[in-house]
Design a protein with these regions (language model features):
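Beta-propeller fold detector
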Residues: 115-118, 292-293, 353-361, 412-421
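Surface-exposed, charged secondary-structure patches
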Residues: 72-88, 100-107, 112-119, 132-149, ...
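Sec-dependent signal peptide cleavage junction
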Residues: 20-43
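Short, solvent-exposed aromatic-acidic interface loops
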Residues: 167, 291-302, 420-423
Length: 443
């Protein structure tokens, strides 16, 4: 049931290193191979972040962009707005001095302007600004709108925050649905509540899987309740509202619960995992039902003797069931990506290095920023790309594709190009085959 993702080293490579005893790979995770631009991170302030609320309930967090994005593709969060048309917000300044906070509302279908203005009457207290966005009275119930906030800092930089919004026809729908989703999640950790969980599942052998990396409403009860895994939550649950629909047949809301868990493996070593649990709740005549359920689990992978062996790399429990890796033509080096972190291994020299570490602390980070290995040569030199929302200090707030070169001997990583894009990572992933190719030794 606790199926893991494993990369198997090629047969020829195994023959080349077939020596007595276990192979120990040296880890170079604290090397100088991090992106040279990361040196700038200590010099540059982080961008302000916005936390959105529905009453006292947090329903989403927005990261800022210093470039314009395609609004139609920015669907990470939707803001449910109460009948009072008020949206409580909190801005974490991250050391920036905020001059103004503006908003802009557009029609979802034709992008025409509905409302814009400036949010007044706020004060900063200890690096946090509490304020309220008042939605326009002309916004219709159940209709979806583009909503953008613009923060101007003292350095005259404008930072953009993209989301969507919809006016609700009742004030208790969202809090009750979130409470219901959280309760369902809690029940999956309690075997005594398994009958409560089973009541909402639709098991189908056609979709059966023995991997804990992903569980859905069609999975077996044992998979959903973590049967033999027995993890425990080690972080708060962070809720993000994804979709809201209001119809005559009821109201549906989709919410993602992000949190971390910890479990002990067969070697008695504690391992941590990022979890994204998405629940679609349908409310009809005051009663809640589950329309869809999806749970993704990704182990926070560490390069150690438990995960790297004689002829394999054990990537642990991951949503992805197979891992694409690149191998040098002399079959001495292999390179791969796991959860935004990039690794390259010298099979003969029994050495493994990390050219880039995303250090994702949540599934939201994994969703917005991704990595892809392009090529590794016979000397262990690597070309890879980082795409989506940039966490680099040099490109902070930008979105696009960074083309990176890694030098094995010098153990250094250098950015050779940055290509801005107004499309988020999930769209770029689908286009990556066209955007990334290998020709005469260059990207």
């Amino acid at each position: 049931m606790k199926k893991k993702t494993t990369v198997v080293v090629s047969v020829l490579a195994v023959i080349l290193i077939a020596v007595a005893g276990a192979i120990v790979f040296k880890s170079h995770q604290d090397n100088t191979a991090q992106n040279n631009n990361q040196k700038e991170e200590t010099k540059m302030k982080k961008l302000p972040t916005i936390t959105l609320k529905y009453g006292d309930e947090v329903i989403g967090k927005l990261d800022g962009y210093t470039m314009a994005m395609d609004e139609s593709l920015m669907r990470d969060v939707i803001v449910p707005i109460s009948t009072s048309h008020k949206v409580p917000m909190a801005i974490k300044t991250q050391g920036n001095r905020i001059k103004t906070v503006k908003y802009e509302v557009k029609e979802y279908n034709n992008n025409s302007l509905v409302d814009n203005g400036t949010i007044e009457d706020w004060k900063e207290n200890g690096g946090t600004i509490d304020l309220t966005y008042q939605a326009s009275a002309i916004m219709e119930q159940g209709k979806e709108y583009f909503l953008k906030f613009i923060i101007e800092t003292a350095s005259d930089h404008e930072v953009y925050y993209y989301t969507r919004a919809t006016i609700l026809n009742g004030d208790k729908i969202v809090p009750n649905q979130i409470k219901f989703a959280k309760k369902f999640s809690e029940n999956t950790f309690n075997e005594e509540k398994s009958s409560d969980v089973a009541a909402y599942l639709e098991p189908n052998s056609k979709y059966a899987s023995d991997s804990l990396g992903q569980a859905t409403i069609r999975s077996t009860l044992g998979m959903v309740i973590w049967k033999t895994f027995r993890p425990k939550k080690i972080s708060d649950v962070v809720v993000s509202a994804k979709d809201i629909y209001i119809k005559d047949t009821g109201e549906s809301g989709t919410y993602t619960l992000n949190y971390q868990i910890e479990a002990t493996n067969a070697q008695k070593v504690k391992e941590k995992y990022n979890v994204a649990e998405t629940v679609t709740v349908w409310t009809f005549k005051g009663k809640n039902y589950i329309l869809a359920y999806n749970r993704e689990v990704n182990q926070i992978w560490d390069c150690n003797e438990n995960n790297v062996g004689n002829s394999f790399i054990d990537l642990g429990i991951q949503k992805q069931t197979t891992t694409v890796y690149k191998e040098s033509s002399n079959q001495q080096y292999i390179a791969y990506e796991i959860n935004g972190d990039v690794y390259v291994m010298d099979i003969i020299g029994k050495n493994i290095k990390s050219p880039y570490k995303l250090k994702a602390k949540s599934s939201e980070t994994l969703y917005k920023t991704k990595a892809k290995v392009v090529n590794v040569d016979d000397k262990g030199n690597l070309t890879f790309i980082i795409y989506g929302y940039s966490t680099s200090g040099y490109h902070r707030g930008k979105n696009g594709i960074s083309v990176m070169d890694y030098n094995w001997e010098k153990n250094t990583t250098t950015e050779i190009a940055f290509i801005p894009s107004d499309e988020p990572s999930q769209i770029l992933t689908n286009e990556m085959k066209d955007l990334c190719y290998k020709g005469d030794g260059t990207v």
